[in-house]
Structures are given as C-alpha cells and as structure tokens.
Amino acid sequence: MTIARLALLTTLFTPAVFAAPLTVDTYNPQEKGIFAVSSTLVSGPKEAVLFDAQFSVKDGEALVEKIRHSGKTLNKIVITSGDPDFYFGLQPLMKAFPNAKVVATQQVVDHIRATKDAKLAFWGPQMKDGAPTQLYVPQVLASTTFMIDGERVSVEEPESYAAYVWIPSAKTILG
C-alpha cells in the first residue's frame, strides 16, 4: 500500500477527533441579579445548547441576545437544578426559540413540578417585572448523554435534584 493510499484511508476512517472544539460562553448577571447563577452556552460549528436559564426574565432576555449573536441554532436548554434561579428565566427563551427542547433529569423535573408554584408565589412579588408570568416544566431527558455537533456531553448525578454536566472535549463541568 502506498503512503498516499494509507494517508487517504486514515483520513476517511479516523473518527472525528479533529472536529472543531466546542465553545463555552458563560453569562452571569453578577451583582445585577438576585442570585448570581451562571448560564452557559455551549456550541459547535452549527449547534448550540444552553445550560440553565437564569432567575429573572430580564436575564433570560440577555441570554436570548447572546444566543442570537452566536448565529448558532439553539437545539436544547438543559436545566441542571430544580431551584428557580436555574429556570425562571425560560419564558423569553421559549418565545425566541420555540423549537428548542427544554430538558432535565427526572429528579430535576420532579422537584420543579413539586415546588414551582410555591417558589413563584414567594419570589414573584420580590422580582416585580423580572418575574415570569408563565412557568415551564422541562421534559425528562431521554438519555443522560447527548451530542453537540458530534461532541459528547454527559449529565452526571441524575439521581439528584441538582445534576452537573461533563463535557470531555472542553474539559468543562457545568451546574
């Protein structure tokens, strides 16, 4: 076998180890927010997944602008915790990206479902116009592992109401 053929075969049959790396872009409202929780947009060349949606709809709107500015297709929003500072900001995101699936582990979904109304009753008056007028309960993740533009992402500690995410190619933990 010639070197040229060997090089061609190696190129054709090598897995996507040379795929473009994922970009990790974090938003945190800092002192402007009631809770300085981070939301992270992880994207490849075409796709993007948002991890956590902020506490207020105002910060959710800032995420909408960040995602639009990326030029990527938002496929999914993963909620890593059942606490409202991770999902109250979903309303503007769902309006802007209606095709994006909102997902979480079963335990996170159960926690949100069980506590969302009481949390909104408590926090809504304090948040004033930053409070959501509509709450979203995520769908249960079909699998704790999924891909972003060919790169593996794993949701860890799925038995907890506060999971975390491992992105091996970016050597990143979120949540």
Positions of PLM-derived features:
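Conserved beta-strand hairpin/beta-sheet module of binuclear metal-dependent hydrolase folds
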Residues: 20-69, 163-175
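Active-site environment of divalent metal-dependent phosphoester hydrolases
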Residues: 35-36, 57-59, 82-87, 109-112, ...
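Short catalytic-loop micro-motif centered on adjacent basic/acidic residues
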Residues: 49-52, 75-80, 154-155
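Active-site metal-binding motif and surrounding structural segment of the metallo-beta-lactamase
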Residues: 58-104
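Binuclear metal-dependent hydrolase catalytic cores
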Residues: 96-121
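Metallo-beta-lactamase
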Residues: 113-162, 167-169
